[in-house]
């Protein structure tokens, strides 16, 4: 009998019933509610009937309002600047509690950072939320986004109707060079397979380079598996995973811990497991990445040049390059190192963990030269609360000017006051660089935290390896 992949094992563990149409009923361990896709189940949205159906279980039903508020200025400032004046998404989320959802003590940070760090989501679980980047929740778990109608279905039944996806493995072997991070790995993968390469697949990252990453780095990979077209991103459980969970507030204790660990160690793909698609990269060949266009797949190493549409034989791709260059205000064959940066954003569910802030601070440390112009605005939107950052020894960066504050989505997307002005170029550690993503006419370049900090220091994109070796 052929071996099973990690995805196969997680699916089989939670499959309640296989239906005649090929879909299955899957049991859901955790559902997260947030202010964009969840209040509608109470009829909070205009034109939607109020639903009186109750909940299947009083299991922990965490609720977060991440998207609409600016992290800068504190709670009162955030409430004044909600995306819809007069609306309080948090209030609408609290209304969902009337359906007998038991809420939890707030996690110390926004959803994709605070919850794994608190041990609320554990290996072997199924986790869903009305947010595509739910895949961040996290290694050894089956986590993905769902739609608003599915949010209601899970609340009512504790199950989800789904069709099993194909299996895809991205294997990265070797040791990462200095200055190259998980963000560079996943951008290089997307540059290789495109934003549709993982469509219909559950994507598992594997290989010695992946095992060498921290848990925070693995979360970055799982987060951006979505930009590769996959619905799920996963990394197998290993001793690093178990050490990360141990001692967390909501992790099992005593005999329950020993039993859980024995089960978690089985959450790896078997040696003879078959994958529908396998992509292989050599870690030593990956360089710091920068997106130059309006899609995550429009990405190149920092020491290369923007592509020339004249060299593209495919007319569809050629037209796409032309449009992207026009929107981004770039010229064909322009060195990426000549692209000037107006803003720097270090945050989002992709790169806002302590490790990311430290990587940026290490690059920016002592950088007080005239190049650090006051025109370049840093916005740090940390994924963990201020108290938790202090407990982990984070003291912040001395670089100025820097805006920093509460946790939240901030400038990742233009649905709160943190946004770009038209024509501004932003070195961003977020996950999407579509037209207008960070503000109408704003030009987003996706990079790692270290590369973002290097751009802030130099005022343009530079190879962070040069700064680290200096």
From Swiss-Prot:
Superkingdom of the organism of origin: Bacteria
Single Gene Ontology MF annotation: 3-isopropylmalate dehydratase activity
Cofactor note: Binds 1 [4Fe-4S] cluster per subunit.
Swiss-Prot/TrEMBL cofactor(s): [4Fe-4S] cluster
Swiss-Prot/TrEMBL catalytic activity: (2R,3S)-3-isopropylmalate = (2S)-2-isopropylmalate
UniProt pathway: Amino-acid biosynthesis; L-leucine biosynthesis; L-leucine from 3-methyl-2-oxobutanoate: step 2/4
Renumbered residue ranges of the record's region Disordered: 50-121
Name listed for the protein in its UniProt record: 3-isopropylmalate dehydratase large subunit
